[in-house]
Regions:
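Conserved phosphate-coordination/catalytic loops
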Residues: 103, 162-169, 192, 257-260
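Von Willebrand factor
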Residues: 149-183, 195-196, 218, 223
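Short amphipathic beta-strand/extended segments with alternating polar/hydrophobic composition
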Residues: 139-146, 243-248
Length: 301
């Protein structure tokens, strides 16, 4: 699964990236992200009046010379980041095959996980799927930290089998009830669901004070379907509902217009909600997506 494109050169390039976050979080170890707590990093935050016992090194003698009052400088504390990567593992992520869609989605998740691990931050992987299909221990990984835990991330993602239906908000809520730390949430899905369904799920993530990115993964066959002209029996991969449909050039244009409108609604909702959004089609080079597109939308520093 990781033979290509996870080459040593690709991993080395991933180590040059760092997630960008729009929020401030409280971490458990010193790290690279701003915290609302006051600390001793080099990023100046504010002043306050001197109190006995304060470190004299942080007295601002310039203010003292002007006001004859003692003030100490305050700095933002830099802390580590907790990142939650949610991967849609419903049946639609297995269309047209697990290798063609779920694997590319997993590759995106694993590339982002490696960036997080290489910065010595914490990452936790979550599978979004019908709860009846998953044991508690297979729904989410533990927190991983450090590059050596990449093999654990790979093992977790490789073991997943897409299947079943997905109620996005309900599945997210099941995971979020166990969440104890705010941080960065990255949701990877095809988002092929009614607008009300993905909006409810994304709003739920927002309610947990998470900085959110939404990455939509589609197969080329979904973007540009190739079917013989004539009558077709189309089967919903999740509900198994079947409909008869007559396919021709007009039907193709109508389908592509509807998909483009759906994707534009998703993108607009994300932008209005302060959520990073990007579309990844499975035949695109992963390296180009990671190193060109994701920095362009502000996901990386």
């Amino acid at each position: 699964m990781l033979a290509n494109p996870f080459t040593p050169a690709f991993l080395t390039q991933l180590e040059t990236l760092r997630l960008r976050t729009r929020k401030e979080f409280l971490g458990s170890h010193p790290g690279n992200y701003s915290s609302p707590r006051r600390g001793t990093s080099l990023e100046f935050a504010d002043y306050r009046r001197y109190s006995p016992g304060d470190d004299l090194r942080y007295l601002d003698w310039g203010i003292y010379a002007r006001t004859d009052r003692l003030y100490v400088k305050l700095f933002r504390e830099e802390v580590d980041l907790f990142a939650y990567v949610f991967i849609d593992a419903s049946a639609s992520m297995g269309f047209p095959s697990r290798e063609a869609k779920f694997f590319p989605a997993s590759h995106v998740a694993l590339a982002l996980s490696y960036v997080i691990l290489a910065n010595h931050d914490h990452v936790k992987l979550h599978l979004l799927q019908d709860q009846s299909r998953l044991q508690d221990q297979s729904r989410a990984s533990p927190f991983y930290r450090g590059r050596r835990r990449m093999t654990d991330c790979v093992s977790f993602a490789t073991a997943a089998m897409p299947g079943g239906t997905l109620d996005l908000a309900a599945s997210l809520n099941d995971h979020l009830q166990r969440l104890r730390r705010p941080g960065k949430a990255i949701l990877i899905s095809d988002f092929l669901m009614p607008a009300a369904a993905y909006q409810k799920g994304l709003n739920l993530l927002r309610s947990f004070n998470l900085d959110i990115a939404a990455i939509q993964v589609l197969a080329r066959q979904e973007v540009e379907p190739v079917f013989p002209n004539g009558r077709l029996a189309l089967v919903d991969s999740e509900s198994q509902r079947e409909i008869a449909y007559r396919w021709n050039s007009n039907a193709r244009r109508d389908y592509q217009a509807r998909l483009a409108h759906h994707n534009l609604e998703l993108k607009s909702f994300c932008h209005q909600s302060g959520i990073h959004y990007s579309l990844y089609v499975n035949d695109r080079d992963l390296s180009d997506f990671i190193f060109a597109t994701l920095p362009a939308i502000g996901l990386f520093k």
